[in-house]
Amino acid sequence: MSNISVKNLSVHYDGYCALKSVDFEAGKGEFVAIVGKSGSGKTTFLHALARFVEFSGDISVPKNVGMVFQHYAVFPWFTASENIAFGLENETKEKRAQIVSEHLKLAELEDKKDKYPAELSGGQVQRIALARSLAHNPEVLLMDEPYGALDAYTRDKMQQWLLDIWTTHKKTIVFVTHNIEEAIFLADRVLVLNDQKFVGEYKISFARPRHESIKFSLEFNKLRQQIFESLNHTNN
């Protein structure tokens, strides 16, 4: 059952074609990763799904969509608790406090609830950003290179944390990254975006839960090479 359906999607900016005639589907609870070079249209695709940009074509997405941006999209003048509470104004005070408490626990930051973003590490700030998106109980979560600015150790920890959350909550996730290893490790499917259109699709068959050790397997490295070649293929 498709939770996201895109048909013949095109996006233009002042005469520039950012996406051209793109088709896409994601099943309910599926984790789909999209890889592509800078300027290939990855972020534009997410923005179209979230209806942040004008487009032509057909997009069917549930109304309740959460988004985690490429750069830390948290309010620096709000504490961790206040950031998670943002947008929950229609809830009762008691319900809002319950949601915030649950998502601080989910983010493993209960002891940092009164800290401001400047007092937290990059990984902690990104956990707050994800917890805030999840606090609204979205059916679909769009993630735009959320770990691109993190060091390798923190990124690996965040990948495992995200998989733990996905396993528990089974949200439909569309995850954009330039990191092929990250895409293979996280996703059920990896799509390659090149020259403003999808040029490759790879089913990831590694059993879940996944462990870092799969990154050293022959199958993993074969997939990585195939995706790399697709990513760097040019039509002459």
Regions found by a protein language model. Give the residues of each.
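The feature captures the beta-strand-to-loop junction immediately N-terminal to the Walker
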Residues: 35-37
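Helix-to-loop junction immediately C-terminal to a conserved catalytic motif
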Residues: 50
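Short coil-to-helix segment of the ABC ATPase nucleotide-binding domain corresponding to the Q-loop/switch region
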Residues: 78-85
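Conserved ABC ATPase "signature" region
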Residues: 94-112, 164
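Conserved signature/switch motifs of ABC ATPase nucleotide-binding domains
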Residues: 115-118, 136
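Hydrophobic anchor residue at the start of the ABC signature
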Residues: 130
